[in-house]
Each structure stands twice: as structure tokens, then as C-alpha cells.
Amino acid sequence: MTLKELRLAAGFQQAEVAKKLGVTTTAVSNWELGKNAILRKYHKKLAKLYGVTVEELIGTMPQG
């Protein structure tokens, strides 16, 4: 699954994820588009939010 698919499967809009993590909606969008890497400090929070392991989350990140 992609980051976007994980987010949608968890039932969140980008704005909701951004608010829960304390980042901008643009940051979440850029993560999903592979424009920016997710900072390590958000890995655990985002994985928990999406109901996956950190390893599964990292596996969805585009390789640039």
C-alpha cells in the first residue's frame, strides 16, 4: 500500500493527519507524493495512527 492508501484505509483526511502530528497539510501531501521524507520523529506516531508497524510504514515510502 502507498502512504495515501494507508491514510484512506485508516479513514483520515490529510488535514486530520497534519493536525494530529502538528505539521502542515502540505507536509503530509509531500510525504505522500514522495517530495519529502517523513522525519524519523513522526514514524511511530504515523504508524500508530495508520494501524501499521514502523517497518510497514517505511516500506511504503517512495525511494528517491
Mark where each language-model region is.
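Conserved hydrophobic/aromatic packing and binding residues within compact polymer-binding modules
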Residues: 3, 17-18, 28-31, 57
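DNA major-groove recognition helix of helix-turn-helix/homeodomain DNA-binding modules
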Residues: 41-56
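Short amphipathic recognition helices of helix-turn-helix/homeodomain-type DNA-binding modules
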Residues: 56-64
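Recognition helix of helix-turn-helix/homeodomain-like DNA-binding domains
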Residues: 23-38
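Short basic helix-loop element that most often maps to the first helix and adjoining turn
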Residues: 2-20, 45
